[in-house]
A protein has these predicted regions:
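Feature recognizes metal-dependent phosphohydrolase scaffolds
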Residues: 1-236
Length: 236
């Protein structure tokens, strides 16, 4: 209750109830007993969490955010508390807080502001990002974020959220999720931020590459506004 509003608590309890009723039948349908599931979890623990595990390096090297130029690469997004942290101490402090939280109390990590950066979809139940928070991100040199987490079925897209430019680059990879979403074939995507000043989005879920060229967009917009001023009518 110290971490979550009542509305969020009810949402989480509903999710738990749904999982309790559906998990074991889903495992049986996949031919898995609870012993199989337990064995898989223990193997994952051995590979990823044990000091000599094959993939132990993954969590040691993991960074929550990567700031380059005016872009911030992040899993989902930001709230006001993280905007405060970034303006005050920068992305190194963000990553340091994340690493510390990973080895602390799991509940604090998952439901606190740090984990909001990997959970938020800017819903009413998510931590708030206000216009002042966006202003602080701008003060930190962040004018656009490149992220995943939002479920997209037709490739990358650009959105303006809370006054912050979002390049949404999620791709559904695993076959089970693709089947549930009605997607065919294998899932793959790449977003190219090119040094020449354009962004290219390529996805198996869209038949063409998507290109964002700021200079070209600005030229077209300026031309449209000039045409509108001369005619006195909106140029649609």
């Amino acid at each position: 209750a110290d971490h979550l509003p009542a509305k969020q608590i009810e949402v989480e309890l509903k999710r738990i109830r749904n999982k309790l009723s559906s998990f074991e039948p889903a495992c049986r349908a996949a031919g898995l007993s609870m012993r199989h599931v337990y064995g898989a979890v223990m193997k994952w623990r051995e590979l990823f969490l044990e000091p000599d595990g094959e993939f132990n390096w993954f969590f040691k090297r993991m960074r929550l955010g990567y700031h380059v130029g005016s872009f911030m690469f992040i899993h989902a997004g930001f709230d006001d508390e993280m905007a405060d942290l970034l303006r005050a101490d920068g992305v190194k402090a963000l990553n340091r807080h994340f690493r510390d939280a990973m080895f602390g109390e799991p509940f604090d990590l998952y439901y606190g502001s740090i984990a909001n950066t990997i959970r938020t979809k800017y819903r009413s139940i998510d931590n708030r990002l206000s216009p002042k928070g966006v202003e602080k991100l701008h003060d930190s040199g962040i004018h656009a974020i490149i992220h995943g987490h939002r479920n997209l079925l037709d490739g990358q897209r650009i959105m303006l959220r809370r006054g912050l430019i979002n390049f949404e680059c999620d791709s559904t990879i695993d076959q089970h999720s693709r089947h549930k979403e009605g997607l065919t074939g294998s899932g793959a995507a790449v977003t190219v931020v090119h040094p020449d000043g354009y962004i290219l989005g390529i996805s198996t879920d869209f038949p063409y590459a998507k290109a964002f060229e700021p200079k070209r967009t600005l030229t077209a917009l300026s031309s449209a506004l000039t045409s509108e001023d001369k005619s006195g009518k909106p140029n649609r």
